[in-house]
């Protein structure tokens, strides 16, 4: 099977490194792509489930732009809604009617939502959620999960991150995932001072298996927080609309106070949302929180179109089924070659690794071999399925994985 080379991408990265810190920053940085020689750095175009790099190589994309692509790149209904709004107005003096329409739609769609607020990135709304909780309770402390990720605001980081100081997370308490006793202990040790508990619906760290909630975990957590007047914040930025259109909490059967949404909300257009209960609406209004482009109407129109299409086709069900089919086949292929692939998390956004080498070096090489054959995988982060991935894509991916295992044996 043909393998790709990346001469144009490499040359462009050298230019980028001259004028941009690290060449490419953040989660697109090449440091996450190991072996680095097996990955492209720059994309030229995208359509459906695929993208093409600047060297003309075609990839079935299982990262989906790290989550925002959910219906397929360049989806006509979403793009047309965006373009129609852009012909009218986007960032202008005054809010758009699209903002009201989108808020109404989310309130109708999500059972716990009585109101909605819009921003751009996931961190915008996780940060806002914590601010609301502190205003509502008059307390300082926030409990989070060790290894949990809620963006790059200083309070969200942990010790050792460049640019953050100890004071930034003085009031953040970290506990282990699924550790109900640890949560109860943290509340007891900080009487009357815990404002919020923030967590993802299930635990999806990097470089480690995803973990589902234990039976009854969320129901017990919800009851404990209600008893102690603590705000329950669900960071649904990554899982949102991939497990349940009504919020991932509905998938697991509990009711948070605030839900943070972003990635799959608008099929790649820049928008995030915080939705919450009536009891927190007044406190949300007391916090002055804004951004230069947070009222942009184009992404709001795109989000409306995206959410309606996701609901129409029952996208969570579609993606879960596609993911299960993909993973079952991959596990079987690995077994045929004498290896063991372990899939964790939801099939619509799984984390995969080979258990034959705990160092991850073998798995990194395997993902790289698949990528340079046309199935874009990362080894450190969960993948994403979209409704655009086809049966043909899945079969092609199986063929690529089979060839990659053969190459690893040579």
What are these regions (language model features)?
Residues 1-410:
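Conserved N-terminal phosphate-binding loop of PLP-dependent enzymes in the Aspartate aminotransferase
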